[in-house]
């Protein structure tokens, strides 16, 4: 709530699916559909998927379209949802200083591969989308921005994202503004300098990764790409 907040707010968060690479490790291909028995085993929150779907309906996509989604796109959207939530909650809390002088997110990491409030994945502690949101929102040198428009209400256009790789650096460029741009590198277990970021139209953004990769298989997608599949 933008008008009401506590002096110190602790143990709050938003669920999201684990990274899709993790889902592939703990499922067989026939289990990768919403909401398979195996996926339900990896969701321990009471009415967890129902709650996630209600949040997606409010902020990202009509609930009638959620049922048509594949698991990979659903995973992406829930992570965008977690990013959006923590970015704005932390931003609102910090904007209330000095009345609010403390905000503690639940949770950092997982003890098993599962849909949860964690902002890092069980395997290799790889960041989920919200990890990047938290890193930015907790910076001391900025006043964190607060989104005034819900993603579901954004006038998204096809960003036609292009990318090129040189050494351990990926350069991205979009013809139209792009939201929640996600870079996936197949088999990569390290960290990127940024992910799930926004791109301004016509401006290049450089993202680095750890180590060296031999002929990496890279996929880049944005919120427009996912939502456009379910029009």
Language-model segments: what does each one mean?
Residues 174-191:
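Short acidic, flexible loop segments centered on an aromatic residue
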Residues 166-176:
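Short beta-strand elements of extracellular/lumenal beta-sandwich folds
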Residues 101-107, 182, 219-221:
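Conserved active-site loop/cleft motifs that coordinate metal ions or position small ligands
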Residues 136, 140, 145, 188-214:
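Intrinsically disordered, low-complexity Pro/Gly/Ser/Thr-rich segments with frequent PxxP/GP/PP motifs
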Residues 161-163, 190:
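Beta-rich interaction modules in large eukaryotic scaffold/regulatory proteins
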Residues 103, 172, 183, 202:
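Hydrophobic, well-ordered secondary-structure elements that form the walls
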Residues 1-145:
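Substrate-binding clefts and catalytic carboxylate motifs of secreted carbohydrate-active enzymes
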Residues 136, 140-157, 212-231:
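Terminal connector regions
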């Amino acid at each position: 709530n933008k008008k009401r907040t506590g002096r110190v707010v602790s143990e709050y968060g938003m669920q999201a699916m684990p990274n899709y690479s993790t889902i592939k490790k703990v499922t067989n291909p026939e289990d990768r559909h919403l909401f398979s028995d195996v996926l339900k085993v990896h969701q321990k929150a009471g009415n967890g998927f129902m709650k996630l779907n209600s949040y997606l309906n409010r902020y990202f996509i009509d609930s009638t379209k959620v049922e048509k989604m594949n698991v990979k796109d659903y995973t992406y959207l829930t992570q965008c949802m977690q990013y959006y939530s923590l970015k704005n909650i932390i931003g609102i809390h910090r904007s209330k200083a000095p009345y609010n002088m403390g905000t503690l997110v639940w949770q950092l990491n997982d003890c098993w591969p599962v849909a949860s409030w964690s902002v890092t994945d069980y395997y290799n502690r790889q960041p989920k989308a919200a990890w990047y949101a938290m890193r930015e929102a907790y910076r001391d040198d900025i006043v964190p921005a607060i989104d005034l428009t819900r993603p579901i209400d954004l006038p998204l256009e096809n960003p036609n994202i292009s990318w090129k790789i040189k050494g351990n650096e990926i350069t991205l460029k979009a013809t139209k503004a792009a939201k929640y741009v996600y870079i996936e590198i197949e088999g990569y277990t390290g960290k990127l300098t940024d992910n799930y970021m926004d791109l301004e139209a016509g401006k290049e953004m450089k993202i680095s990764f750890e180590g060296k990769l031999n002929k990496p298989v890279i996929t880049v997608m944005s919120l427009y790409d996912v939502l456009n599949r379910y029009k």
